[in-house]
């Protein structure tokens, strides 16, 4: 029998009441303390009804932190081998890396933070089970920016990920290791998460394909959120077909994530097969948003992008300029949502209140213990962003958050208008090539030193609108440059077909 819960004092009740917006008198606090304590004893039965339980039966082999010799780009936090020997499916023979905010039973999950060392999930994320059932061999947990907050990898508690194209430069973030692992060849396919571009940024910088599907296509059970209303799980691979195949496997409805009900509208499960019907370039109509090709784009990237567009036009594609005006303010819309949702998650000890369960109690228990100091041990970026969210919540009642959520609908409408008559929108994925290590400002504001480039300017809008987006290498010489294609909500197959067409013409 689990021991009874400890009683609380009137002072604790007064403090808790204030945090809930209650104006309690001293007499109120004493009265509520008595009634609350009288009820608390009964909750011990819940622990007995649903104990934490043992880990799933998994055969994870050789779990270890790799050496610099084994992992020259620091792409992995943990290496191991996990395969279902009885499975034979579309991913058979492929090595897969998963970002370290996705649970693998029996393997540490850090979310790129030293704060979470010691968290060992008892069961797999649903996407991990789907990978194994499809025959994949999972080879490691990929390094990432702390809490998935950062575009360069430099906030990781386990050190930055270097770029296989040039080890003096960043790999991008926050799915840093996922991009580097695919680019260096240690993985054929990788899973990442994309809240403001975190699949597409490292894919572009490392010269691989990165696909962020429509929001909700991939269920997030067993995934540690940054901002639940914007988080997407996506794929990185060396070609469009493998990225599409990965989404076919991990996508689709799961009752543990109600948002995944949308997957049935997207054709997930047939994305790779649909590539056979990718149109000729002469049948494509594309729009280039003015706002995504403005002064923030470097001359080098602009020239490479315009060359890619010229390749499409030479193959017969129609390309014209369009407008998506609100994306110019997307940074504050995105920040208002992400910072508030991060602060709220830290306050509630990352409890998945929006998921029906069942939940991995090992992760929740360890997370609660790790966060007992309310953020002590996190890096400056995570703490700064959470504090901004706390200010917006506590001093301004969350009104900026709700208005930002409303602005997402406006951005989605503008994307729909720009896409009217076009198969997809096309823009540079990133405004610059991968910066050198240490060159990018670590914070959003307030630093006088370092490169100040809005790295996620062109990627955030698709997350805010919830629409599918894919980055494909431009095919040019020099450091990698990605070309991003964006389609309408639930048009995942369409955007992948367009990407395949570009891949085909840029290879010739």
Please provide the spans of the model-predicted regions:
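Short glycine-enriched, charge-decorated loop/helix-capping segments at active-site entrances
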Residues: 111-117, 441-447, 485
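Amidase signature
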Residues: 1-91, 249-457, 464, 490, ...
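Short glycine/serine-rich loop segments
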Residues: 124-255, 464, 468-475, 479-482
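Gly/Ser-rich catalytic/binding loops embedded in alpha/beta enzyme cores
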Residues: 8, 17, 23-195, 310, ...
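A short, well-structured catalytic beta-strand-centered motif of the EAL phosphodiesterase domain
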Residues: 96, 483-489
């Amino acid at each position: 029998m689990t021991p009874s819960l400890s009683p609380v004092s009137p002072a604790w009740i007064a403090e808790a009441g204030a945090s809930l917006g209650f104006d309690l008198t001293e007499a109120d606090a004493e009265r509520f303390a008595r009634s609350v304590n009288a009820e608390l004893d009964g909750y011990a039965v819940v622990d007995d009804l649903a104990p934490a339980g043992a880990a799933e039966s998994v055969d994870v082999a050789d779990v270890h932190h790799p050496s610099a010799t084994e992992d020259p780009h620091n792409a992995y936090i943990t290496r191991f081998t996990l395969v279902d020997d009885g499975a034979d499916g579309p991913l058979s023979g492929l090595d897969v890396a998963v970002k370290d905010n996705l649970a693998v039973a029996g393997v540490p999950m850090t979310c790129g933070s030293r704060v979470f060392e010691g968290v060992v999930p008892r069961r797999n994320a649903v996407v991990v089970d789907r990978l194994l059932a499809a025959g994949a061999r999972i080879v490691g947990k990929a390094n990432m920016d702390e809490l998935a907050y950062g575009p360069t990898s430099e906030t990781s508690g386990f050190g930055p990920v270097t770029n296989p194209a040039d080890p003096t430069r960043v790999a991008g973030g926050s799915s840093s290791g996922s991009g580097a692992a695919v680019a260096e060849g240690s993985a054929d396919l990788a899973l990442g998460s994309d809240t403001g571009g975190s699949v597409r940024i490292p894919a572009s910088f490392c010269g691989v394909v990165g696909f962020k599907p429509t929001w909700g296509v991939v269920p997030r059970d067993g995934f540690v959120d940054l901002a639940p209303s914007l988080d997407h799980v996506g794929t990185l691979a060396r070609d469009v077909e493998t990225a599409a195949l990965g989404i076919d496997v991990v996508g689709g409805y799961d009752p543990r994530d109600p948002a995944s009900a949308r997957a049935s509208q997207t054709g997930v499960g047939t994305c790779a097969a649909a590539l056979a019907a990718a149109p000729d370039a002469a049948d494509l109509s594309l729009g280039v948003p003015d706002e995504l090709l403005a002064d923030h784009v470097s001359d080098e990237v602009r020239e490479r992008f315009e060359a890619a567009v010229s390749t499409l036009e030479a193959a017969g594609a129609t390309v014209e300029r369009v407008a998506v005006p609100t994306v110019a303010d997307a940074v504050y819309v995105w920040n208002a949502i992400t910072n508030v949702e991060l602060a709220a998650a830290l306050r509630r000890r990352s409890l998945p209140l929006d998921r029906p369960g069942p939940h991995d109690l090992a992760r929740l228990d360890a997370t609660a213990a790790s966060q007992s100091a309310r953020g002590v041990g996190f890096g400056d970026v995570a703490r700064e962003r959470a504090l901004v969210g706390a200010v917006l919540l506590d001093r301004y009642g969350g009104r900026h958050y709700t208005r930002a959520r409303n602005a997402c609908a406006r951005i989605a409408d503008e994307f729909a208008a720009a896409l009217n008559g076009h198969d997809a929108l096309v823009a540079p994925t990133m405004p610059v090539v991968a910066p050198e290590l240490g060159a990018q400002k670590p914070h959003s504001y307030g630093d006088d030193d370092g490169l100040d480039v809005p790295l996620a300017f062109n990627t955030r809008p698709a997350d805010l609108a919830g629409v599918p987006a894919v980055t494909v290498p431009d095919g040019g010489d020099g450091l990698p440059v990605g070309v991003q294609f964006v389609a309408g909500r639930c048009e995942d197959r369409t955007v992948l077909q367009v990407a395949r067409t570009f891949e085909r013409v840029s290879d010739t």
